């Protein structure tokens, strides 16, 4: 399974992904983080093309790891809906898009992505305002989360 956590910088995507792996003992999971992908592939381009390239690299890596029977959690802004939707269509029921958001600015306002496109269909919604990380994890894995 691939869990694709998308949302603005500072919304809690990486915190949530790391907690899932560490606190819930999902040791066989692989975590792909947007900052790590940028560092690994030396992509410092924050233009639309640079962001799309970063997302594509993460998608390719997630698909590869999934093909090797790894569960993957991706924490990445991935601002463009069309790109996320195409990957969801390609992966079918093997991917769950999770929109992580907050109304708080958490020290990353300089990284705010003006053209971020929120999901509108077939996604799980997690608002990290006034909620503990464990509560977010429980919500994420709840069968009733839509």
Outline where the language-model segments fall:
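ATP-binding Walker
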Residues: 11
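Conserved beta-strand scaffold positions in the cores of enzyme catalytic domains, especially
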Residues: 29-31, 95-99, 123-125
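Walker A (P-loop) ATP-phosphate-binding motif of ABC ATPase nucleotide-binding domains
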Residues: 2
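Hydrophobic anchor at the beta1->P-loop junction of P-loop NTPases
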Residues: 5
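Conserved substrate/cofactor phosphate-moiety recognition/catalytic segment
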Residues: 14-63, 67
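Small-molecule kinase domains that catalyze NTP-dependent phosphoryl transfer to phosphate-bearing small molecules
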Residues: 100-146
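P-loop (Walker A) phosphate-binding loop of NTP-binding proteins
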Residues: 8
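ATP-dependent NMP and nucleoside kinases share a basic, alpha-helical "lid"
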Residues: 40, 44-45, 62-72, 76-119
């Amino acid at each position: 399974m691939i869990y694709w956590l998308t949302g603005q910088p500072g919304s809690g995507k990486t915190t949530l992904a790391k907690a899932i792996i560490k606190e819930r003992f999902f040791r066989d999971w692989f975590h792909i983080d947007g900052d790590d992908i940028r560092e690994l592939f030396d992509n410092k381009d924050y233009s639309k093309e640079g962001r799309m390239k970063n997302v594509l690299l993460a998608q390719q890596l997630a698909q590869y790891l999934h093909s090797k029977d790894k569960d993957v959690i991706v924490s990445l802004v991935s601002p463009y809906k069309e790109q996320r939707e195409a990957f969801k269509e390609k992966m079918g029921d093997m991917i769950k898009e999770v929109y992580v958001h907050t109304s708080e600015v958490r020290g990353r306002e300089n990284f705010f992505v003006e053209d971020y496109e929120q999901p509108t269909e077939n996604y799980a919604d997690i608002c990290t305002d006034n909620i503990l990380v464990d509560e977010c994890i429980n919500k994420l894995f709840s069968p009733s989360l839509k």
